[in-house]
């Protein structure tokens, strides 16, 4: 593996695109850049055969070229060490003589080293030694570099890597945009938008119907004051139509579509959108037709009359809106599926 990776100059977004192109499973998209590079190089090194970097993956040409250079260096080092071992094992007598000579030379060098050190220390001028001691105590001359090469210091290596943060923000924004587009292009998202519109129309009309009259007569003012003090009845008048709408326009279609999908044993989706919208369409049509029929009377049944009153309130507030929305959803479901 090369000492300095060829991917070090790449951006994180480019590394993620390359991983998607190589179809790498479990690639750490939210990890550090160094971890991404290690994971990518480990995957490329453990492949059975190199990828086609001439036609399919031209961006990997520099990576494989650097691998070839490193392998040639390793082979050269192994060849040099092997040739040295072979020449050393040619003859026992020659090896013994060479070792004796090496020991003698080493001993002579050890004897000469203290003398040379003393001579250099003696010949070193006093001013230079004072300058070195002053440099150690002068904090303005401190050197924080840890490398042997004086041209590269720790200050040149430090950087904030703002481009990586900017690339992360751009990648996250692009990912969020794609997720929003994928969600809004589904039938369930369309049904959710239609339901929110129906709910807003219902709440607006209920609140408009519950406002007191603007008449200035004394009787109307007293009635408005009594109605204002009757908080319990006002809460019921506001909550019961909403609960009725949730039951008939959301609850029953959801239950029917879930049951039909459960019978079909389709694990890809939880609710059948066609069954949901068709059930909602039939319920909306039945409520709209029945509420507009003046000949039906449910006053003899108190519970049915209360439920029917709430259904008529919902029908007066929404009109044909649920009917139209469910029909549009059915057509969209047929178009998509």
Curated annotation (Swiss-Prot):
Chain ranges passing through the membrane:
240-260, 314-336
Cystine pairings recorded for this chain? none
Region annotated Disordered sits at 66-95, 107-132
Kindly give the InterPro entries that the UniProt entry links to this protein.
Answer: Put_GTT3
Could you list which ranges are Perinuclear space topological domains?
Answer: 261-313
Phosphoserine-modified residues are where?
66, 72, 99, 116
**Misc. remarks from the entry:** Present with 1300 molecules/cell in log phase SD medium.
Name listed for the protein in its UniProt record: Glutathione transferase 3
